[in-house]
């Protein structure tokens, strides 16, 4: 179907846009402009802080607007424009301002894509379609990382900026090719069709009165506190070993992880209804904790690459399960997107704190101490998820699968 292909293309092209420059910015600033780890970690955190402040308002905006395609297109252009300004003005304050704008605009992507998906496919097909979304997203990330690695060998780290601009144009074409009249507005909000507005809980009641949603937000924050800084730290170690090959090696790390994420996302789409969400999410925490330990075993670039590939398991499971669990917890409330934005705010808090804290630990205690600390936080998050979170999959689906 046309709308399915358009949604595939949107997730593919948006993959390189939704996170801005990500770890490539760390390599670019370190290798080309001589920034230190603390300064690099700080500007990465600025994008995270801007994103977390904008996440909940962005979710509320997506709930309230019907023009979700236009909102997503504007956000993609804003992120691309902010990132493309960095090579022109590479000083601290211009880079910080660009990261601020990019982080705020990127807050729109997760709730907008989830809302469009739910509005197009409905609740029954949402798990399968979300797994497919994430598979295409990871395929796009793998393509972008491979292209960035190849282009950087010829043109240097500056190549990633041109690539981001091209992917932004692709995402613009994709989102505008989704038929606007195919998106059901009530479904896109997670609202029961035909339910009077007065019968809905308020957004505030949905966010604060749902203990499972609050517990999930805390676990998400810990997951990203443990995970967000790992790839930038690996990129810094690779750049220190060989400045000319740092970006290319980082791209190999990303490609390997993204290729693993594709089958993980497909697994979630195919089996999360039958197996339940909880065991899959716990597996993601376990692999993340193991990575933190394994990074300290050797400094060899190829070892770092192999360990980073394991990110594909944890992040692949997390990325696909995240909107599914929020949809489970907010079913029928009409506030799916603001809830998704609020939990993504917790995610942003964890990611921003991760980059800032890990940078400081590296400066004062070294890379191994930072990796071990991040791995320990992942183990703590897994324990809390096991203790606090119920199984959110429909109980009937689990019973049918098990019986």
Task: Pin down the residues of each PLM region.
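Cytoplasmic helix-loop-helix junction between adjacent transmembrane helices
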Residues: 100-139, 325, 332
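Juxtamembrane intracellular "pre-TM" segments in multi-pass secondary transporters
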Residues: 1-2, 181-216, 403
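C-terminal membrane-cytosol helix-exit motif in multi-pass small-molecule transporters
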Residues: 166-188, 381-389
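Central cavity-lining transmembrane alpha-helices of secondary-active solute carriers
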Residues: 42-60, 255-267
